[in-house]
């Protein structure tokens, strides 16, 4: 990384120059620097609304960058150790889908864990690729799926030598890391591309002593959520590619679905955040890791909770653990994770990332302070004292291995009918069902609906999980294939 070049922020600098010129706008957006919508200015501020501008020659164009955006992407590639980088304004969802659409066509096989984000499975609906699932092991106590074991990947490749790609979560939402370097070496030896979903792994590129990043492991493409742990605005992301990937073709794929009206608020936030991480990321993420470790120790000293970390590492299904993650098991105090999540928000004004059936996740990043950690620890101690109960009747287990009947694309576009959830047992799902967050589908199109899955959906609803994916907003009915 050229640290001197990293002091530049070309999109931000171009916007600063643009502001000085007092250009009269006869283009979009129609609020005309906020003059047409004073309430927007009141909410967001004059400076923010004044920078919500359209693509123009001095500001470049994201669909075909030739100047400041191109330079910003080159700086991002240098900072992340990639051959090329693409600034994304459709979230990491669009980056994940661009990876898959760039490597797979209709009928192609892709090897992936089933505990992927819905964006990956949505990409299979779009392109018609066939999933070959490597079903990860479960941690029976925590109820979470683990990483992809190298032996599982080897078996999947042996049985599907014509696969085009392997997709790896690095890390999972809960912080679990696979042996990425070995997976990359194995796949490449068979001529198969490796894609990494690093929605929760921006910090891996800049922190010392953290798990290995996708590009460092030799992956071909990586989708990186700068807005999650990198400090940019929500919805901004970066797609990274290695030297053996045709960057021009990837740009064409991105432009199939990405907006032609890219937000310069998002683009400049990516530019500024990349500079910040390149110059100060190592120091910042060292503090994040320290805060997370302190929180783990304090929470575990309360009793009843289990804030897990590298103590889980076993060298296979948990090859490493992302120590910045603060994942906490709650069932031993008699409360589901979603119940603790709701209590923290409703009674203590603390908003954490998510709560599921067994766990909660508090996202620790460069914007957190030690006093915020103390407040969280105090609230968890209070919740245990005031709300803990007998754990009888609580369901454990966060992931159920699916049985695939037809491809996601075929199922999604098939004729379907609506049936009540428990009456759908034995049918093939025609839609997604998931708790969001984390956005890992309980059911995907083309999968067999078992009694266990149906009961899990009902239980998750009863516990207050936010359910998504179904046509029925109440999630009382499921769309299933007619035949």
Language-model regions, residue ranges each:
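Short glycine-rich or small-residue beta-strand-to-loop segments that form or flank ligand, phosphate
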Residues: 59, 86-88, 166-169, 327, ...
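Structural signal for conserved beta-strand scaffold positions within catalytic alpha/beta enzyme cores
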Residues: 87, 133-135, 224, 354, ...
């Amino acid at each position: 990384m050229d640290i001197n070049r990293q002091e530049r922020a070309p999109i931000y600098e171009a916007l600063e120059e643009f502001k000085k010129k007092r250009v009269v706008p006869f283009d979009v957006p129609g609020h005309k620097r906020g003059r047409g919508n004073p309430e927007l200015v009141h909410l967001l501020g004059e400076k923010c609304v004044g920078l919500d501008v359209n693509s123009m020659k001095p500001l470049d164009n994201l669909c075909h960058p030739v100047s400041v955006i191109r330079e910003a992407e080159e700086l991002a590639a240098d900072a992340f150790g990639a051959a090329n980088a693409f600034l994304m304004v459709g979230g990491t969802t669009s980056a994940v889908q661009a990876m898959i659409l760039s490597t797979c066509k209709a009928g192609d096989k892709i090897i992936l864990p089933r505990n992927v984000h819905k964006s990956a499975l949505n990409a299979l609906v779009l392109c018609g690729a066939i999933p070959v699932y490597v079903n990860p092991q479960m941690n029976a106590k925590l109820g979470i799926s683990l990483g992809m074991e190298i032996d599982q990947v080897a078996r999947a490749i042996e049985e599907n030598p014509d696969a085009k790609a392997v997709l790896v979560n690095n890390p999972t939402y809960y912080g679990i890391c696979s042996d990425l370097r070995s997976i990359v070496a194995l796949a490449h030896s068979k001529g198969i591309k490796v894609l990494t979903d690093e929605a929760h792994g921006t910090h891996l590129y800049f922190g010392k002593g953290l798990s290995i990043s996708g590009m460092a492991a030799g992956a071909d493409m990586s989708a990186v959520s700068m807005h999650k742990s990198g400090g940019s605005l929500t919805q901004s992301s970066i797609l990274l590619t290695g030297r053996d990937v045709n960057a021009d073709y990837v740009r064409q794929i991105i432009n199939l679905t990405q907006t032609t009206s890219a937000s310069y608020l998002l683009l400049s936030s990516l530019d500024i955040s990349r500079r910040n991480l390149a110059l100060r990321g190592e120091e910042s993420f060292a503090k994040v890791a320290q805060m997370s470790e302190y929180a783990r120790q304090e929470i575990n000293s309360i009793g009843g909770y289990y804030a897990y970390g590298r103590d889980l590492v076993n060298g296979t299904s948990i090859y490493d653990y992302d120590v910045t993650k603060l994942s906490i098991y709650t069932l031993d105090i008699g409360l589901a994770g979603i119940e603790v999540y709701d209590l923290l928000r409703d009674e203590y004004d603390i908003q954490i990332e998510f709560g599921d059936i067994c766990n909660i996740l508090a996202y620790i990043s460069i914007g957190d302070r030690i006093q915020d950690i103390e407040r969280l620890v105090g609230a968890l101690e209070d919740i245990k004292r005031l709300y803990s109960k007998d754990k009888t009747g609580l369901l454990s287990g966060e992931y159920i291995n699916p049985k695939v009947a037809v491809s996601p694309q075929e199922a999604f576009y098939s004729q379907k009918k609506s049936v009540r959830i428990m009456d759908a047992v034995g049918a093939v799902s025609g839609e997604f069902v998931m708790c969001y967050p984390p956005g890992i589908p309980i059911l995907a199109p083309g999968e067999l609906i078992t009694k266990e899955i149906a009961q899990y959906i009902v239980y998750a609803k009863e516990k207050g999980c936010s359910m998504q994916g179904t046509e029925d907003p109440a999630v009382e009915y499921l769309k299933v294939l007619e035949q």
